């Protein structure tokens, strides 16, 4: 058994949303920066259709009118993909990879912001199928036909699985860094490491790199820090991967 790719989509997607500064926060004088993280909520397949529901959790840091410490406001930018997908059925397996490639914030007025995000969207769908090979001729007269044989290496997809897990850790600020007051922003990058097959399972490792921007407790000035956490996880593919050719 293997998994055949029956649909593929790769395009940049641009979405925007307005957000209002809460009443408890001062007016915006100048936008300092904007950051965000893409969160996929759901993936659905129907006959000839693929739907992906996601959103960008954005953070905008700005200077308040009249001076003072920088302020932070959160914004949600919805991302909805409705794709025509010939060949896709309700039994197809959807895979979605959304990457934030750009984000910016613009002041519409001192109490309202426009946040625009650009996302690289990659959506694929797979169908369970069987591989078949022809290794010769059969039937009347087949013995009179000369057949040239050769060897080829193929790499079929034998399983498509996903797993959600949580990585948590506690960090200490590096020596010399000011004590943390309010957390202004944080961002996360995930880098995969080794991947190996053990029976029907895939064992994989990686590193979570987190960057933070915060207000110093005593001075209110902005400071930044970075931290790393390694992880190791396992996922069951329900497929025998003991062959040395599996990767």
Whereabouts are the PLM-identified features?
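Viral structural modules
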Residues: 1-247
